[in-house]
A protein has these predicted regions:
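Conserved C-terminal helix/tail region of periplasmic/extracytoplasmic solute-binding proteins
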Residues: 353-430
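Mature extracytoplasmic/periplasmic domains
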Residues: 289-366, 427
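Hydrophobic h-region of N-terminal signal peptides that target proteins for export
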Residues: 5-18
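Periplasmic-binding protein-like
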Residues: 108-110, 216-223, 266-290
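Hinge/lid segment of periplasmic solute-binding proteins
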Residues: 59, 65-68, 85, 89-142, ...
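Ligand-binding "clamshell"
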Residues: 91-100, 132-134, 259-274, 337-341
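Early extracytoplasmic/lumenal segment of secretory-pathway proteins
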Residues: 18-94, 395-400
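Ligand-binding pocket segment of bilobal, Venus flytrap-like solute-binding proteins
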Residues: 175-176, 183, 187, 191-271
Length: 430
């Protein structure tokens, strides 16, 4: 219903302003991925900086491919959108993006002043068909893929390896992200752990391997995991973990932070592990599509979203981690509750021993075992087909029970204050 009214309101504004499109900024972002109070602040700030009025039309999506289809096939005139890393890669190769003009006149360039050098290097690795992704996109949020686990039932040693996913000890207590891309990447790393250790292959090479052999390897492993799986989930897995219906969950760090906090309130000890064999990092970033109309307001929007105070507010609301390496951001999330870790790779040399939640920001020693995923391009259908074979045509009885229990629980909670204290809802990132 909320989404319906948002779309209706946007339609009314667009109709009223159809003759003034140059003063409208159409933003297309993930659901629940921003502190929405910053939107009117941007409108006022933009007029202060440029002397021109602007009205933001803010719309949301839940699946990368939905957004991409609207732009690639429908030629929708969104001015700024926020796709994931592999979609940025695909859009670059398809010539769907405009280069980002970083000239803001007398307005500070918050983008280049605050972007973490680690994130800049990662965007340099995006396969853009000869184009540098840093010239066409600016990071927004980032995170890792790891294992969320219940320390009451699973030891730190057991969860230090991806092989824990096929441990029969945890039958019917394992939840797996319904994301072929993320699952494939973690498992191919595990399966080639010895080659990695021997220097016969690199993480980057594994992330670019979409061969039939690689697909078959992962499929074989996951078919061993399948009998132990309680559910293939897009979003409900973290809730099952907080309620102790699940003990292990292949999950994203943002969901991990959310689940750990919620579980602690009811006395459940959830933790997050980055297995020793390696893991992947992911990114979402702002881009200006080729069919954009108000490119000036679009670049100012990206600049505004890179301002440290706005960054902090968005992180606090969404639970995800910004790409900003600004000292104000580090200060905001420093917490003496945590042991000191080395974040010099992200915030600079002075951050070599800081007390920050390691689920939000991995230690340098961990990040050195990380890999960056890429778009599969024409090989994507083969990945999707493998995933369908792994899951099978129908859901297991346990999966159906879990879904039913989840739905009943939501109803009983009365959507629990805008669904668990206004924290993020389903975000089918991949």
């Amino acid at each position: 219903m909320k989404k319906f009214f948002a779309i209706a309101a946007a339609a009314v504004v667009l109709a009223a302003c159809s003759g003034d499109r140059d003063h409208i900024l159409k933003v297309y972002n993930w659901s629940d991925y921003i502190d929405e109070s910053v939107i009117p602040e941007f409108e006022a700030w933009y007029e202060e900086q440029t002397g021109e009025p602007v009205k933001v039309i803010y719309q949301t999506f839940d699946i990368n491919e939905t957004m991409l289809s609207k732009i690639e096939k429908g030629h929708e005139d969104y001015d700024v959108v926020c796709p994931s890393d592999y979609i940025i890669e695909r859009m670059l190769k398809s010539d769907l993006l405009l280069p980002l003009d970083r000239d803001f006149g007398s307005t500070p360039n918050y983008i280049d002043d605050n972007l973490s050098p680690y994130i800049r290097d990662c965007f340099n690795k995006i396969e853009g068909g000869g184009k540098n992704a840093n010239d066409y996109s600016v990071g927004y949020m980032w995170g890792t893929t790891g294992i969320l686990y219940n320390a009451k039932y699973v030891t730190d040693e057991e969860v230090s390896t991806w092989d824990v996913l096929r441990n029969p000890k945890f039958a019917d207590k394992i939840f797996i992200k319904d994301s072929a891309r993320d699952v494939f990447s973690q498992i191919i790393i595990y399966l080639h752990r010895e080659d990695l250790a021997a220097g016969k292959v690199t993480l980057d090479e594994l992330m670019l391997d979409s061969s039939d052999e690689a697909i078959a390897e992962v499929e074989n492993f996951m078919k061993q995991v399948k009998p132990l799986v309680a559910g293939w989930e897009a979003d409900f897995g973290k809730d099952q973990m907080t309620q102790e219906r699940g003990w292990l969950s292949l999950n994203w760090s943002g969901d991990g932070v959310w689940a750990i906090e919620e579980a602690a309130e009811v006395g459940v000890d959830l933790r997050y592990s980055l297995p020793r064999e390696g893991f992947t990092v992911w990114f979402d970033g702002w881009v200006i599509p080729k069919f954009a109309v108000n490119t000036k307001a679009a670049k100012y929007w990206i600049n505004f979203m890179s301002r440290p105070d706005i960054v902090i507010r968005n992180v606090e609301v969404t639970g995800y981690v910004s790409v900003s390496g600004a000292p104000e951001v580090l200060e905001a999330f420093t917490d003496e509750e945590y042991d000191a870790i080395d974040l010099s790779y992200f915030f600079g040399a002075e951050a070599d021993s800081v007390c920050v939640n390691p689920v939000l920001y991995p230690d340098r020693a961990d990040i050195e075992r990380s890999a960056q995923e890429h778009d599969w391009g024409e090989r994507t259908p083969y990945l999707v087909a493998m995933w369908s074979r792994v899951k099978g045509e129908s859901a297991s009885g346990m999966t159906m029970i879990v879904v039913a229990v989840f739905i009943v629980a939501l109803a009983a909670f009365g959507i629990y204050t805008k669904f668990f204290k206004n924290r993020k809802k389903a975000r089918k990132r991949r």
